[in-house]
């Protein structure tokens, strides 16, 4: 018998697996290897909600935990996936400058918000009122991280590449059985895949579609992350990631021309240089009505638990939530009610 079965290898799955490895727990992962939010997301780590210039839920705490966590994964996987870059928010009007100065005085923001407005010196970026600058920010190459972690598990023969069959899961006196595998616990971290599992139908998970593009723009020459309705993230070699859209109505797989038009419209308001589109990708983020993660042990089946609802802040939230769930299962540490699965009526 092993300690854990993990279903799904996105950011939440990788985070929980890494926590298990750090605590010498045995586990296997079941994952179908198809596109997930972790493979198409922007990967930004930023504790400030730029639309309102306010700290996100537990932002400083999440930042303090997430970056060392990913750094330890870099060592294990022998990769570089953490990329530091300031975020420059375009000040659309003079009133934005006052809001920015006010935000810089909030205690939870001081470590990240520069009080001084940065003047625009890039000739192809439209920012007549300058930028509000965030420091200690950047992005994680989540696609690389998930890919390399998958290879690591394959080399250790602890990855089963298959679609999880919910009907094949059996409950035993000491845990669960799935095929020939017996385990003390099974943890579901498969994002929107959880929606089709009847055992979790009481959780109001939603599929929120996001699309982004990768462009090539030789004249942009910008290393900072630019935000002005969309993010522009430098990938090197004159390539930039542009995104992302949020669509609650479109449930179809694949990219859309409407999303491309929306991204291009916003991008053309920011830059005046010629560019061409290299690729466009789409994925679904799992979200909840209150925009909070959902983690914990199933109210009826104590052998099964979940980490889900990361939304667009999975890079920051996944390591934190993985740690909370592990400590809850192994040590009985309470999970905060605002992200506890028990906030939804079973």
Which sequence ranges carry the predicted segments?
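Hydrophobic anchor at the start of a short beta-strand
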Residues: 4, 26-28, 110, 186
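Helical element adjacent to the flavin cofactor pocket in flavoenzyme catalytic cores
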Residues: 132-185, 189, 193
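Short beta-strand to alpha-helix junction loop
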Residues: 53-65, 132-148, 254-259, 316
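Beta1/beta-strand and adjacent pyrophosphate-binding region of the FAD-binding site
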Residues: 1-10
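Active-site substrate-recognition segment that forms the wall
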Residues: 12-19, 23, 32, 43-44, ...
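C-terminal catalytic lobe of FAD-dependent flavoproteins
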Residues: 276-346
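Dinucleotide-binding Rossmann-like beta1-alpha1 core, especially the glycine-rich loop
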Residues: 44-123
């Amino acid at each position: 018998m092993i300690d854990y079965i993990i279903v799904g290898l996105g950011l939440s799955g990788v985070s929980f697996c890494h926590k298990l490895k750090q605590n010498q727990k045995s586990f296997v992962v079941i994952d179908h290897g198809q596109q997930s939010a972790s493979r198409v997301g922007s990967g930004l780590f930023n504790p400030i909600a730029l639309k309102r210039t306010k700290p996100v839920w537990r932002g400083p705490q999440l930042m303090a935990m997430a970056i060392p966590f990913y750094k330890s994964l870099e060592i294990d996987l022998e990769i570089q996936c953490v990329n530091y870059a300031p975020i420059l928010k375009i000040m659309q009007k003079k009133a934005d400058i006052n809001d920015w100065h006010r935000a810089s005085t909030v205690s939870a923001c001081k470590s990240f918000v520069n009080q001084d407005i940065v003047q625009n010196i890039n000739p192809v970026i439209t920012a007549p009122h300058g930028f509000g600058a965030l420091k200690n920010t950047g992005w994680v190459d989540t696609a690389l991280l998930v890919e390399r972690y998958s290879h690591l598990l394959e080399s250790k023969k602890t990855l089963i590449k298959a679609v999880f069959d919910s009907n094949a899961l059996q409950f035993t006196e000491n845990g669960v059985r799935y095929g020939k595998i017996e385990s003390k616990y099974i943890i579901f971290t498969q994002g929107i895949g959880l929606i089709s599992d009847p055992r979790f139908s009481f959780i109001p998970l939603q599929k929120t579609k996001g699309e982004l593009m990768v462009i090539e723009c030789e004249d942009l020459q910008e290393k900072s992350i630019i935000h002005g309705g969309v993010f522009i993230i430098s990938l090197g070699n004159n390539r930039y990631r542009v995104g992302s859209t949020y669509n609650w109505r479109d449930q179809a797989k694949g990219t859309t021309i409407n999303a491309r038009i929306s991204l291009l419209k916003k991008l053309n308001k920011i830059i005046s240089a010629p560019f061409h589109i290299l690729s466009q990708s789409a994925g679904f983020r799992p979200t909840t009505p209150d925009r909070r993660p959902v983690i914990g042990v199933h109210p009826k089946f104590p052998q099964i638990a979940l980490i889900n609802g990361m939304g667009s802040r999975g890079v920051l939230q996944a390591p934190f939530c993985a740690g909370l769930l592990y400590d809850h299962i192994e040590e009985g540490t309470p999970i905060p009610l605002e992200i506890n699965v028990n906030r939804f009526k079973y």
